[in-house]
């Protein structure tokens, strides 16, 4: 009499060599953490080939190489990609974003150049910018900070005044509705209170950071990788390491002029269609600068960015 065949155990959904879908939730060098779309445990992935174009927020296809590792073989179509660049290299921030939240503080003194560049990057990528002024409980420094931010309020930018440590409930009440359902990247210089803000909005952020750091084998570098935190009310918060420079060498002159909201209504009124808005006669931008409708600091930033862009061979 023939014996009945033994029943084989069910095979895992994504075996070695089989493609699966996921989302990149952390990046450190060429190491990436991918959260599988099927809800399985996260795994460490590496890009195929020497050059990596993977960013946090990317939807990717990967092939599993072991129980907890894989190779990224394809990057899904992106809505956008935020990055900074100089003459020699680019640094990716994140992909598929809706908003850019810039964290400033009354002290230490924030860089207005970095603020201006972050706003230009947001405009060029069609992201909604939100400016946070933290540490408003430092009352001695508050009037100067407000005065410095007044021109940006006048341009229509959201400027939220918070004290994340001193009044956390108020900070959460202001931010949570603006972040719900959106993918938001958090940018700021070191010392502005960015980490405190993340811990306020993502209660288990420290535990998640330790877990990701262990998976990346980078326990000594817990603040030097970009990571994505899902939010309780939907959406995601992407925290990027603090930085001191924000090069935008990759933006063409045409993209730059349209990234200044105060320039846009005037662009069609220049005498020359290829006006550079630097010293040309009949330039509507320069006329607005002369009569005070455009701030000198903003035009100076535009001129600097155009100069930087001219250094790149396209």
From Swiss-Prot:
Binds 1 zinc ion per subunit. GTP binds at residues 134-137, 188-196. InterPro entries: G_CP_dom, NA-bd_OB-fold, P-loop_NTPase, Ribosome_biogen_GTPase_RsgA, RsgA_GTPase_dom, RsgA_N. Gene3D superfamilies: Nucleic acid-binding proteins, P-loop containing nucleotide triphosphate hydrolases, Probable gtpase engc, domain 3. It is found in: Cytoplasm. One of its GO terms (cellular component) is cytoplasm. Zn(2+) binds at residues 270, 275, 277, 283. GO terms for biological process: ribosomal small subunit biogenesis. Keywords: Cytoplasm, GTP-binding, Hydrolase, Metal-binding, Nucleotide-binding, Ribosome biogenesis, RNA-binding, rRNA-binding, Zinc. Its cofactor is Zn(2+). It is an enzyme of class 3 (hydrolase). Residues 1-21 are annotated as: Disordered. Residues 85-246 form the CP-type G domain. Its EC number is 3.6.1.-. One of its GO terms (molecular function) is GTP binding. It comes from the Bacteria. Belongs to the TRAFAC class YlqF/YawG GTPase family. RsgA subfamily. Monomer. Associates with 30S ribosomal subunit, binds 16S rRNA. One of several proteins that assist in the late maturation steps of the functional core of the 30S ribosomal subunit. Helps release RbfA from mature subunits. May play a role in the assembly of ribosomal proteins into the subunit. Circularly permuted GTPase that catalyzes slow GTP hydrolysis, GTPase activity is stimulated by the 30S ribosomal subunit. This is Small ribosomal subunit biogenesis GTPase RsgA. It comes from Burkholderia pseudomallei (strain 668). The lineage of its organism: Bacteria, Pseudomonadati, Pseudomonadota, Betaproteobacteria, Burkholderiales.
